[in-house]
Amino acid sequence: MSRSRHVGKIRKRLEDVKNQWTRPARADFSDNESARLATDALLDGGPEAYWRALSQEGEVDFLSSAEAQYIQAQAKEPPDAPDSAGGAESGPRGLDSCSLQSGTYFPVASEGSEPALLHTWTLAEKPYLKEKSSATIYFQMDKHNNIRDLVRRCISRASQVLAILMDVFTDVEILCDILEAANKRGVFVCVLLDQGGVKLFQEMCDKVQISDIHLKNISIRSVEGEVYCAKSGRKFAGQIQEKFIISDWRFVLSGSYSFSWLCGHVHRNILSKFTGQAVELFDEEFRRLYASSKPLMGLKSPRLVAPFQPNKGPEAPNGRLSGTSDSASDRTSSNPFSSLSTGSNAHNQSLSTSSGPSSPLAPIPPTVPRLQPYHSTRRAVAPQPLLVPMRPHEGAPAPYSSLMAYRPTRLQLQQLGLVPRVTHPWRPFLQALPHF
């Protein structure tokens, strides 16, 4: 009987705020039961049931028109019919599985290959653990550091892995940058795309005629936000509005920027660059979302052992990443990738040329000692692991690491028995050499 005279939590607070003589109450962050009942009514019965629940609970209309339309459009029926075996026990069990995302995805995913694959990321040695924490902010007004150019530069300079979480992906040029990094440089790319943006992404791929055959080293997966479940079992999923890029586990680009033409040219956005311990938080969030994602295009179950394998030797990560935390001026400069700026000296330019697709923040590698003449060719040229780029500081062979390089060509051929030792003294250079 007293249910109709009940005053909702939001309505009561509005009345207190409007009355200037009322003392401010303590902030209450508990759940609003009236709002939950009204949302369940909207999910089960539509707008009329929603208004009826608001009237019974004495609550104000707390949903915007866009939110109400989204809930009705994304509503899904429960996977199991309520008439199935189990009776009343099926209701609470279905509610628990829907409301607790960790209880839904992780126990199921831990039995497959993907969670074990993600678990190797934790065991791998991360370069960001040796970096000093820093943060740099970029705005759209900075014409010298266009946000779109910074994102594309990050993709073009990746050398091992790119982990991308995005809500909208319709920029064809950024797609070309990702395809070039994966197909030309062997960079493993994993893109987690919001379920709401899947249709637009597939539309872009159809326009430019991109299919699975072009995504040999790319894994594109769809992911949803949190799941809201009513007591009846009907549910709807939220959106992924997080956007960030993890490049080689060294730094993260995060902000409001989406992979679209409007965001690159018209919309105003903000972009933040994080290094150091903050990268680990983004890595953990990416792995959690990866565990609940579904394959969309490209690799269905990628084997990340080769791309994610840490560098051989304990000194390789230090030598490659110490330049990012040497000075504060490098972290707070106008250009986050100082080696790509036009004012770089000749030494930095030669470094970026020799290191290929290595990081733009990589320091000058130490000089590789030349091997002694008694080292053999087989010992100097060691087999490299698959998909790991060669770098001067990772044990690459020196240019002159063999005894054969210090001897004339004719003496080398004589040792192999390919050239007769007796030649005419007056015609030493006319002797025909055998062709291999």
UniProtKB/Swiss-Prot annotation:
PTM (free text): May be phosphorylated upon EGFR activation.
Gene Ontology molecular function terms on file: identical protein binding; phosphatidylinositol 3-kinase regulatory subunit binding; protein kinase binding
Keywords (A to Z) from UniProt: Cytoplasm, Mitochondrion, Phosphoprotein, Proto-oncogene
UniProt cross-references to Pfam families, sorted A to Z: SACK1 (PF07894)
Family recorded in the similarity comment: Belongs to the FAM83 family.
Subunit description: Directly interacts (via DUF1669) with casein kinase isoforms CSNK1A1, CSNK1A1L, CSNK1D and CSNK1E.
Places the protein is found: Cytoplasm; Mitochondrion
Gene Ontology BP annotations: cell population proliferation; epidermal growth factor receptor signaling pathway; positive regulation of adipose tissue development; white fat cell differentiation
Region feature (Disordered): 73-95, 302-371
Keyword NADP among UniProt keywords: no
Annotated coiled-coil segments of the chain: none
Native source organism of the sequence: Mus musculus
Protein name as annotated: Protein FAM83A
Cellular component per GO, a single term: cytoplasm
Skewed-composition ranges (Low complexity): 350-359
Expressed in which tissues: Widely expressed, with relatively higher expression levels in adipose tissues, especially in epididymal and inguinal white adipose tissue (at protein level).
Keyword Mitochondrion: yes
Stated role: Involved in mitochondrial maintenance during adipogenesis. May be acting by playing a role in the maintenance of normal mitochondrial function.
Stretches with biased composition (Polar residues): 321-349
